[in-house]
C-alpha cells in the first residue's frame, strides 16, 4: 500500500509533524516485530468489519477498471460507477463452477477475504449504499440468450442477495430493447436516457450495470456567485464553463508531493464525500495519480486530510455515459469468461459472457442542505490564503463514508462533457 505523504504547509501551524525519527523506539501501540525482526502491520480496524472489507475489495476492482478505461481514453472524460459492474459480476459468480468462480473472485479481490458468506455481505453493502438518504441509484442485471432454461437453484440466491431476477431474451430485438429500457427507467426513476442500441443477435450472457447520482453538498453554494470562468483544457486551450464559488469554504485538504497534486474532500449529505485530485500543473496526463488509487490509499487520505478554510471554485457538472466495458474486462484477466467458462450452475447448456454494458449519470450543482458548515468541522487557523480552484483537468472519487465503498469515479478533462 502506498504511503500517503501529505505536505500540508499547515502542519507546522498545527504545532506537530507526522514524521518520526527512524532511530526512535517504537511508540506504545505500534506494530510488534515478527521472528525476523521486521514490523508486522496490523490490519486497520475499519477493514475488520466484514462489509467494509468487502467494499474495499470491490472498490479495488473498480479502480482497476477505471485505470483500464482511462488508459484507452487519454483525451476524453471518463465516468464510471464500478460498483454496478462489480455487482453484476459478483451475482454471475453464483452460477459459476469452481474454476470460473475463482477467476471472477480474483478479479473482485474476493481471494483476500475470509468471509464465508460473501453474497450475504454484498446484500448488506448494497442496502447501505443505496439507502434513500444516499441519493445513489445503482442496479445490475443478468440477461441470457433466448429460450435458455435457467435452474431455480441459481435464481433463488440471486434474488435473495442481489435483489434481481435474470431476464431471458425473446429473440425480438425491438421488444428486448424496449423491455431492458423499461427496466432501466424503473430502476433509475427516469434519470437515465433510453438506449437506442439494439441487442446483438449473438448474445449468450449480457451483464448490465446502471447507476445515477445527484449530489447534495452539506453546505450549498450560493448560486448568485456562480459565473462563467476559464477552464484550462491544457497549457494552451481554455473554455468558459459555469463555475460555482465559495470564498470561505470549509473543506479537508492536503498536498501530496509524491503525486504532485492538491487533494480536497467535500462532504455530501447521506454520509458521503467527494475527494478531488488536482495536479499542481495543468495537464491531461493524470496517470501518476491514477496508478496510486486503491481502497487503502483513499482510506489513508480520509484519515490524514486536515480541515481548512479556502477560496473554492468547482465547475457545475452533469455527465452521462453509455457504452460497453467488455474490452476493459477482457484486459483484466477475465478473458476466459468470454471463451470457455463453466456456468453449469445456471443451465445445462454451454453459455459464455458476450457483452457487459454500463450506463451512468452523474450530476452536481449548487444544491446543498444548509448555508453553514457542519458544526463538527473546525478549520485550522491559517496565516496565508488557501485557494483550491478546479479549473483544470482533475480526478474525483465519490466515496461512501460508512463503508468506504467507491461509488463513482471520474476523470474530468472538459466539464462540458460528454
Swiss-Prot record:
PROSITE patterns for the chain: SERPIN
CDD domains noted in UniProt: serpinF1_PEDF
Record InterPro entries: PEDF_serpin_dom, Serpin_CS, Serpin_dom, Serpin_fam, Serpin_sf, Serpin_sf_1, Serpin_sf_2
Post-translational modification summary for this protein: The N-terminus is blocked. Extracellular phosphorylation enhances antiangiogenic activity. N- and O-glycosylated. O-glycosylated with a core 1 or possibly core 8 glycan.
Gene3D superfamilies named among the record's database cross-references: Alpha-1-antitrypsin, domain 1, Antithrombin, subunit I, domain 2
Subcellular location: Secreted; Melanosome
Gene Ontology molecular function terms on file: serine-type endopeptidase inhibitor activity
Spans traversing the lipid bilayer: none
Residues annotated as glycosylated: 285
Primary localization class, coarse: secreted
Known function: Neurotrophic protein; induces extensive neuronal differentiation in retinoblastoma cells. Potent inhibitor of angiogenesis. As it does not undergo the S (stressed) to R (relaxed) conformational transition characteristic of active serpins, it exhibits no serine protease inhibitory activity.
PANTHER family assigned: PIGMENT EPITHELIUM-DERIVED FACTOR, SERINE PROTEASE INHIBITOR, SERPIN
The name this protein goes by in its record: Pigment epithelium-derived factor
Phylogenetic classification of the source organism: Eukaryota, Metazoa, Chordata, Craniata, Vertebrata
Gene: SERPINF1
Amino acid at each position: 500500500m502506498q504511503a500517503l505523504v501529505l505536505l500540508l504547509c499547515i502542519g507546522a501551524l498545527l504545532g506537530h509533524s507526522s514524521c518520526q525519527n527512524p532511530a526512535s523506539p517504537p511508540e506504545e501501540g505500534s506494530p510488534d516485530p515478527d521472528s525476523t525482526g521486521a514490523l508486522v502491520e496490523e490490519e486497520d480496524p475499519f477493514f475488520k468489519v466484514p462489509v467494509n472489507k468487502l467494499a474495499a475489495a470491490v472498490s479495488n476492482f473498480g479502480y482497476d477498471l477505471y485505470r483500464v478505461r482511462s488508459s484507452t481514453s487519454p483525451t476524453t472524460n471518463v465516468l464510471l460507477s464500478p460498483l454496478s459492474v462489480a455487482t453484476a459480476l459478483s451475482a454471475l459468480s453464483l452460477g459459476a463452477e469452481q474454476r470460473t468462480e475463482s477467476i471472477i473472485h480474483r478479479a473482485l479481490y474476493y481471494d483476500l477475504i475470509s468471509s464465508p458468506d460473501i453474497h450475504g455481505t454484498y446484500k448488506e453493502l448494497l442496502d447501505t449504499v443505496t439507502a434513500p438518504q444516499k441519493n445513489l441509484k445503482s442496479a445490475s442485471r443478468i440477461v441470457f440468450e433466448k429460450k435458455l432454461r435457467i435452474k431455480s437453484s441459481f435464481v433463488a440466491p440471486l434474488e435473495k442477495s442481489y435483489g434481481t431476477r435474470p431476464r431471458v431474451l425473446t429473440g425480438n430485438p425491438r421488444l428486448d430493447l424496449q423491455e431492458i429500457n423499461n427496466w432501466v427507467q424503473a430502476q433509475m426513476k427516469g434519470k437515465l436516457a433510453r438506449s437506442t442500441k439494439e441487442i446483438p443477435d449473438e448474445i449468450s450472457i449480457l451483464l448490465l450495470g446502471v447507476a445515477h447520482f445527484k449530489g447534495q453538498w452539506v453546505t450549498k453554494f450560493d448560486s448568485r456567485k456562480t459565473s462563467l470562468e476559464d477552464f484550462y483544457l491544457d497549457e494552451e486551450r481554455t473554455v468558459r464553463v459555469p463555475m460555482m464559488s465559495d470564498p470561505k469554504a470549509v473543506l479537508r485538504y492536503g498536498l501530496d508531493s509524491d503525486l504532485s497534486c492538491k487533494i480536497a474532500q467535500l462532504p455530501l449529505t447521506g454520509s458521503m464525500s467527494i475527494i478531488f485530485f488536482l495536479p499542481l500543473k495543468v495537464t491531461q496526463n493524470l496517470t501518476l495519480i491514477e496508478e496510486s488509487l486503491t481502497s487503502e490509499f483513499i482510506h489513508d487520505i480520509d484519515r490524514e486530510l486536515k480541515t481548512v478554510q479556502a477560496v473554492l471554485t468547482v465547475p457545475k457538472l452533469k455527465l452521462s455515459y453509455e457504452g460497453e466495458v467488455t474490452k476493459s474486462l477482457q484486459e483484466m484477466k477475465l478473458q476466459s469468461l468470454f471463451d470457455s467458462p463453466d456456468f453449469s450452475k445456471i443451465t445445462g447448456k454451454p453459455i459464455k459472457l458476450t457483452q457487459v454494458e454500463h450506463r451512468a449519470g452523474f450530476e452536481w450543482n449548487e444544491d446543498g442542505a444548509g448555508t453553514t458548515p457542519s458544526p463538527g468541522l473546525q478549520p485550522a487557523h491559517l496565516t496565508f490564503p488557501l485557494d483550491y480552484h478546479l479549473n483544470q483537468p482533475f480526478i474525483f472519487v465519490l466515496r461512501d463514508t460508512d463503508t468506504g465503498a467507491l461509488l463513482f469515479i471520474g476523470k474530468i478533462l472538459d466539464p462540458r462533457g460528454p
